[in-house]
Amino acid sequence: MSSLRDQLAQVAQNNATVALDRKRRQKLHSASLVYNPKTAATQDYEYIYDTALESFHTLVSLDLRFKVFTNSLFSASSVTIDRNVQTKDQIRDLDNAVNAYLMLISPKWHLTPALHATEWLIRRFQIHIHNAEMLLLSTLNQYQTPVFKRILNIVKLPPLFNPFTNFVRNDKNPTDLTLIKLFNDMDFLKLYSNYLSKIIKQKVTYTNQLLFTTCCFINVIAFNANDEDKLNKLVPLILEISAKLLASDSSDCQMAAHTMLAVLATALPLNKSIIIAATETILANLKEDDARKKALVTISKLFQTLKGVGNVDQLPVKIYKLVDNSFPFEYLLQFLSNENKYSSDKFFTAYIRSVIRYDHDKLSQIVKILRKIKLEKYEVRFIITDLIHLSEVLEDKSQLIDVFEYFISINEGLVLKCLQALNLTGEVFEIRLTTSLFSVKNSAEQSGEDIIKVLDDAKASTANGSAVPFKDFMTKNSEFISTKAESMLLVKDEKFVKLLSLFVEAVSKGYQPGLFLSSFFTTLESRITFVLRIIVSPGSPVALRLISLTQLSKFINGIDEQTDLFSLVPILVTALMDISRSVRSNTKKVLQQIAKRPFTAKYFLSNVLYGENLKVPMLSPKDSKFWLTNFLSDYIVESTDISSLVIPSKNDMVYMLFWCNQALHLPLAYSKTIMLKLLTAVPQYAFTYSKVFEQFMATYITERSSWETKCIKNKTNFKDFETAVCAIVAPKEKNSFAIDFLINCLESEYEQLSNIMADRILSLYPTLKFPNQLKIVQSIIDSSVDKELSYDGLETLQSLPLTADIFVSVLKSNTINSEDQTDLTKRRRRRSSTVNKSALQKQDISQIAEAHLKKMTIILETLDKLKVKSNENLLNALFNLLSDLETLDHDGGLPVLYAQETLSSCLLNTISSLKSNNGSMKLPSIRADILVAAIRSSTSPQMQNKLLLVVGALASVSPETILHSVMPIFTFMGAHTIRQDDEFSTLVVERTISTIVPALLKSTEVTNKSDEIEFLLMSFSTAFSHVPKHRRVSLYSTLVRELGPSDVIAPFLFLIAQQYSNCLEKFKIAESKNYIEFFKAFLSKFDILEQLHGFNELFNLVELLDEDSSKNEVAPTRTLFSNGIVNMSKSELFVLKKNDLDFIDKVIGESKSDYYNTSSNLKLRILSTLLDPNIEIEVKNQVRNEFSILLSKTLNAINMTDSLSYDKHSSAGSNDEEAGSESEAEVDQKELKDILFGLLEHVLDLLPIQDFVASILPLLQGNTDESVRHHLTVVTSNKFIEEPMESFETANEILSTLVETTEKASESTQILQVTLNTISSIVTRFGDRLDSHLLVKSMENSCKQLTSKKIELEISSLTVLTTLIQTLGVKTLAFYPKIVPVAISIFKTYQNAKNNLKEQLQLAIVLLFASMIKKIPSFLLSNLQDVFVILFHSDEVADSVRLSVISLIVEHIPLKDVFKTLQKVWTNDVSSSNNSVAVSLFLSMLESAVEAIDKKSATQQSPVFFRLLLNLFEYRSICTFDENSINRIEASVHQIANVYVLKLNDKVFRPLFALVVNWAFNGEGVTNTNMSKEERLMAFYKFYNKTQENLKSIITSYFTYLLEPTNNLLKQFISKETVNVSLRRLVLISLTSSFKYDRDEYWKSTSRFELISESLINQLTNVEDVIGKYLVKAIGSLATNNSGVDEHNKIMSDLMISHMKTSCKTREKFWAVRSMKLIYSKVGDGWLVLLPRLVPIIAELLEDEDEEVEYEVRSGLVKVVESVMGEPFDRYLS
């Protein structure tokens, strides 16, 4: 029975749509899927129904299944149906109809009619409330659409859909994580499973819904991947859902189930029974082809998850039949071919084992599966073991042969191990399967033992089974009995194979071999030839071959002595190559047996052995005997190569002919293979013997198929056979039929034959004569073009050792232009003609031309690959071919680009080979104009590059050949090639330059070489901006290096600077920087002399731009000035010059990038040259000379600047315009001067310091321009900053000059300032290493400048004095009066003034005093107060700097003087300044001094410190800061005072403390009379409280000094004479801490206790609420301190009770109760005896009128008392 809650919930659900009031009805009616609530509220049911009915009819037209709802949900009567008044049955029917409709509408929510139709159900039947679950389930897969969001806004969420709560009436759609949370609920999964069952049953599933379901379940599995328990709970549910989906006829449902099962099995491996059941379910209803593949993949994945024992056992028979019916064998093969990405070995192992167990008809086909799948080793072992067991019972064992051959081919050892595990051997198993299988044999085995084993096994098997009498066996197979005296070597393979199988079967059944042979072969000839064929048959088991040898030996004994058995020897010799040692050993015995017989001319079966009436030439008996005897004596069983024994060196021609004939006529493929291998392996084999095989070679290709069939049937390796056949073609072959055979094999349609012969050619080709070589090469080329070859003709061709003559011959035979290109009279290039074009348009000729192009391509590829040793004829032929390709390109329009590129490579290789062999040579027959024309006409940059390389290579071999084409080539390169951004193009240009330019320079035919060079530079520099940025340095450095750096750097620099100028004028700043970066990197490729020389020559070129120089005839005539410079105006020339100099300046100067790239740092290069001891002195002098020239040219340019003038405008302007023009000229000249000064600075910075000083001293000492001297002085300062200390002598030289400058009265302020700054920099760097006389002189001059009244000079002088004091120390004492007073005066002068240099001045003064403090501290004491004042008031100086100076003061100045000075400074300056920073710095200094002072000094200076301390206490009354700032200052003072007190002993501190008490209470020693007593008391008590916290019980007794005053103060608080809450709080805190830290029973003294207790407790009468808690703590602490003294307890109790009486004030009683509660909570046991007196008081208070008092007593005091007594307090009240 359901609970009451459930019943109520059901009632609420049923009445959810019952609305008794209008507002609720309106709200229910306004819930709409389409309209907003306001619109929906105004609509009636008729309107809604009409709209919905129209949409419903649209749905019916789309899907007729909706028609069923015509008479129910969408009937006309539905308008009047009210769900709330329906019966249960009617409601049930309505719900069923709605649910059916929702399941059917699910895939159509994206359609507008679906929304409008469903709108009716929502508005009329409230399905969003009563059918909410089905509505949500049917739309769940639409969770990311607006429709679902609308549904969430109106639906009443069922409990299981709680994860959607946050998305109700929200703009956001549910997330994927929300769906995972939803599906992670087991109850919801069950609900969804039921829903799936319904839609599957109703057949209303659809793809998107199934895809959504699948994804959700996969996400849930993935979400719980690490929770095995949860996965185990999911398994039954997912299996149930999968079963329902699989039961559906829909392929989509089935594939959804497949996916879920596969994912589940991957996440949680299932046991085998579940997987078998799942497999059965999957296969039970598998009908659609779409689902079949997915089903197989799923089954494979399920099986792949199996682990442990039995995971690859055969399938149950029922499952196997289902698999076989669902997946035909061919389907499985196709699946394995296409789906290699899936691991399915376990399923297919189980399937194969099932085939072995149940379905033997498919045994022969399982090899196809095995070849397509990779199995684990253990799986292979299971299958092999099953097959071995099957071989015992299977009738037709031939079905197993292919399978075992496959397993043996991949792992023969494993098969043998499986046999051994079952007590079987390989030989026995071969007998069982009636075939030869194994190739790996034990070398120690013996034939006798093998035979015994075979016979024993056969007998055992016969005994176990029902033995068939031999007579019956013979009768059954009587059709195969041979009665003719025939050679069994000639019998058809089918018959032989059958006889072989019968022989094996007979042996395996235990029949005697002799009985079988004598019964089935009635003649001796047939018996012997049969066993002979078995011996050399690869398909016969080893045991059978041994038996056959034994039988042959017996048969030989039965032949008469007159018959010569040497005719059997050739076949037996081939048996000596058997893999089995036992076979070889027994064969040797048979040969020995034959050797013992007489040799006669009567050969056994001489005319019928190899064919009817086929007479094979034989050896004479004598030769036969000789050969066999020697052979057996030399043969060893272990031998693997017996070719030298077969063809002995003596009488080798006879034996070669004999064995060649034997090889020719042998009908057995295996024996023929062995014999041919033996013959072709001996060195005697030559073309004379290959004639024997002429007919065989002529017919082989046509008969190849029959030979292949023979090999297959006899298990002979056909590839080995064909290799032996191809080897018939002998080295040094001369026979044309053999060459034809070779060519025919290459051109045959058989891939194996072609490849074998192609490999054979590689070894034969070098031994052939030239005509045959040419014939083979030409045939390969022709066949490669004419037909599709079975081998790689091009690879074969490229593998042959072809010579240049071969290529020349081939090229000549394949040429188009017949005219002689080498004829010197025909210098003009052939032009493409209309005749050629029209001819090549014809189809047949066009095809010929295409074939010709293909041939040429093959030839060129081969030549390019081989790189043969070349000659001039080959080069001529290649040039002719270049002309041919142009013809095909221009006239025929054929795609010759690849051929041209390959030809270019061939030309390069050929020229390189000629150069390495012959060096320089003349090639008059070569046409360079062909190359130039090809370069120009080609549209391919790569082709152009390669041809340029050819030009360069040709120039290195024969310069005259290309000399006349130099300019066109370079013009083309400048316009095209150097613009390509690839490594190859760059390499081409560099190589072309490096080859052609030297030829140009060496040539005697070229005049005006400088013009040519400048034209060349202009061609390349014009294309600079188009050259890829990272290619420029390499390209242009190569060009300049080849042209000659000493002559070319300057013109090239000039051209680049001109482009730099153009960029600046066009405001392309970023691009202009690229030129500077480029040229720095460019110059790094040359040595320093070349760089300096280039700069000097560039100055010469720049000078030509001046106005006067422009009239010079040199400038216009130079090629360098032809690109627009000659036509420039004067103003344009001036701008160009200015920008050129700026370019030089930036190239020479250092930048940030030079820090990381030392190679482009000019300064570093000069230094390394001058300082390197390995460089010769002469070179260093040359560097200095070049630098001198550079410096002189720079200075000359500066001197010439003033004389420059130009007119920007026409002279016909007004005076105003002229004035403006002159102003612009002055600005430009100033800019030019600045550039030149910067250049001068950078030039001077290039040299080492010694050379630098030597260069500038004359300039500084002479009458040089002031601006020049100014810049030189600044450069000097910077120069010395990074110099090592060893340069002090050089520094003395420059310092002397600078000191002299400061002495000159005529010098300007600017010069004096920069000079003083430089002196300071030098002194700072070198210190006392400098000449002391110069330093003193500098001091004197600085003191003079200190009084100059010019702030710039004052700052610089102070800086110099600071460094000098730092350096000289005490030696500067004589200048003290000239420095310190003046500095103090200067500070005061500018202290309140506004000046931009004020900060620098204050900093300079502070640093001056800092250096004095450090170096001469004792002499500064007289002005220490002034120093402190300056330090505290240098507002412009950073606080960190001033704090550092404070540290110096504390460290170097005696602390007693520091304290005294601090006291004076505070009194006289800081206290009255209202400067918070000054106060902060003062306290910082005081703190540092207190921390640094030792105890002895602290004792001595204690009076001074405490006077200062009292002054600091008084600061409160005079400062204007806010209260927080004052409190922070006092907190710092208290902290400093406590640190100081810790360094004093009691003897010293006690009188000082008394002094402070007198100051506080009596006003003794007060300096500020305006300070009130209360302010003093507050300051004192703060100090005392802080000290009490630090010293604790040490100063408890000190309270004696303030006991009476404190008592009086407490009384004043009671009497309200003093009303100061803060002061009262401080007093109470002081008493509390004193009581708390009393360790010497100080307060247990009755006199003190009685004195203080009354005053303290009486504070209850009027204590302020804000400090009441402090009074409670004080009283509690006093009670705790005196808890052991009963008298004191009684006194306190009486006093406390007196404040708790009813007559007392309310707050008085309240705080008294609080105090009593604290007392009892702390010392309750001691006060228990006093409780009776307290009980009446408590009783009265419990009935107090004030609720707060009554509550405090009841909940506070009473509870504490009860806890102390351990019993209820009520009993005392009763």
From Swiss-Prot:
Region described as Disordered: spans on this chain: 1206-1226
Chief place where the protein resides: nucleus
One annotated Gene Ontology cellular component of this protein: small-subunit processome
Signal peptide: none
SUPFAM superfamilies given in the database record: ARM repeat
Residue stretches of each HEAT repeat: 1734-1772
Pfam family, one: BP28CT
Annotated Acidic residues bias: 1215-1226
Keywords: Nucleus, Repeat, Ribonucleoprotein, Ribosome biogenesis, rRNA processing
GO molecular function: snoRNA binding
UniProt-annotated location(s): Nucleus, Nucleolus
Biological process according to GO: maturation of SSU-rRNA from tricistronic rRNA transcript (SSU-rRNA, 5.8S rRNA, LSU-rRNA); positive regulation of transcription by RNA polymerase I
Family, similarity comment: Belongs to the HEATR1/UTP10 family.
Record function comment: Involved in nucleolar processing of pre-18S ribosomal RNA. Involved in ribosome biosynthesis.
Subunit structure: Component of the ribosomal small subunit (SSU) processome.
Name of this chain's protein: U3 small nucleolar RNA-associated protein 10
Organism: Kluyveromyces lactis (strain ATCC 8585 / CBS 2359 / DSM 70799 / NBRC 1267 / NRRL Y-1140 / WM37)
